[in-house]
Design a protein with these regions (language model features):
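Generic recognition of short, well-ordered alpha-helical segments
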Residues: 18-22, 104-108, 133, 162-163
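Internal, well-ordered alpha-helical segments in soluble enzyme and binding-protein domains
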Residues: 65-68, 109, 164
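Residue-level marker of alpha-helix boundaries and capping positions
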Residues: 60, 100, 122, 180-181
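Asp-based, Mg2+/Mn2+-dependent phosphohydrolase catalytic module
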Residues: 1-5, 111, 123, 127-243
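Catalytic-core regions built around general acid/base machinery
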Residues: 105-118
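N-terminal helical cap/lid subdomain that shapes the substrate entry/recognition surface
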Residues: 2-9, 13-104
Length: 246
């Protein structure tokens, strides 16, 4: 039986592609917007690849943000941009992030869990101040105790490292074997949960494909916000219906 649940933030609690798309349209109007979904996925890829260098002290956060923007654009045949242009994109992107809201289906899911008194938590990769600002903006403190929110930069670890999941299990007072982690990234969220001995739900609403030869290690896969509420409701309303084998 699953007794507790922990969520990723970016592109799980809210639609992160929306602010990215608006920033791209404003800053690079000649970019082929038909590639937007794939460009966003690659932007997230470069975020995952580059941020460890910030954690290691090799790059500044500012350079990392410029680099992920530049590399994404180059991959889609766009001209190489300079740091000033990249910094402007980041400013516009951050401004658009001020407008993020929790989607109705996610709010319905969290309301249900709160009503059921299910312990909840948050594990998110990224710069501490930046991520906590999102947590507050999204109203997550209405559902999650601040002591059950972990941002990677503040710990020295990051998803998919098992250490951040071990730390969360201890800090949140949750049993990994009965805790479900929900996130959109297979590499960070699903593999991270697996590494930490947690269960996982892959929230694959961007339609990502696994690399050839990859053995799936998630317990459940859903592909829309609409499916999220139904899956969570079944887990906690009908615990004897074994969607997840403990």
């Amino acid at each position: 039986m699953i007794t507790s649940i922990v969520f990723d933030v970016d592109d799980t609690i809210y639609d992160q592609q929306a602010p990215y798309r608006i920033a791209m349209e404003k800053c690079f109007p000649d970019f082929d917007m038909s590639h937007m979904n794939q460009a966003y996925i690659r932007f997230r890829h470069y975020s995952d690849v580059g941020f460890p260098r910030v954690m290691a002290g090799e790059w500044t956060t500012e350079y990392f943000r410029f680099w992920r923007c530049k590399e994404t654009l180059l991959e889609f045949g766009y001209r190489e941009i300079d740091e000033e242009t990249g910094n402007h994109f980041q400013e516009v992107y951050e401004h658009e992030l001020e407008n993020i809201t929790m989607l109705d289906e996610m709010r319905m899911t969290l309301d249900f869990l709160k009503e059921k008194n299910v312990p909840m938590g948050i594990i998110t990769n990224g710069p501490t101040e930046h991520q906590l600002k999102k947590v507050k903006k999204l109203g997550l403190y209405d559902y999650v105790d601040p002591k059950r929110v972990i941002v990677s930069q503040a710990t020295g670890f990051q998803k998919p490292e098992k250490e951040i999941f071990n730390l969360a299990a201890e800090q949140f007072d949750m049993n990994p074997s009965t805790t479900l982690y929900v996130g959109d990234s297979y590499d960070n969220d699903v593999m991270g949960a697996f590494n930490g001995g947690w269960h996982s739900m892959w929230f694959n609403h961007r339609g990502r494909s696994l690399k050839p030869g990859t053995k799936p290690v998630f317990d459940l896969e859903i592909d829309s916000f609409e499916q999220l509420f139904g899956a969570v409701k079944v887990l906690f309303d009908l615990p004897n219906l074994s969607l997840i084998h403990i």
